[in-house]
Amino acid sequence: MIFSIRQNATLPILKMKVFRDGRNDFRRFEELIENCVATFAMKDEKTGIYKVANKAANIALENPCDENGYKHYIITYQFTKDDTDKPGIFLGEFKLTLFDLANPTQVYGELIAPIQEELYIHILDSFVKTDIV
């Protein structure tokens, strides 16, 4: 997956769909994902140095008013100017920390996405000055 954003930009918001793989109990997965903590990390592809390390991300229903009652979730991250101040190619990952429903202080597990392919983030060079004087 490739996501592009301009240098010093804060939009567009990065969005990734959470797919159900069919290997887990759907109801349990929905309960776990509704009570999880999402974070985002991004590192430079060449140097391996983290530009963003475990900053808060959000989980939301893609379509809260779905007529069929299906729940499709998306994970989102809002970039800051500090996140995008250096042009280049970066690798991004979301981490979902799922908490045990019976004991909310215990971690049930962690899910790192994307699973099937890398998330490449291209921060494109920009000549526009973004600060308003």
Predicted features, each with a name:
Residues 1-133:
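Contiguous segments within soluble domain cores/interaction surfaces
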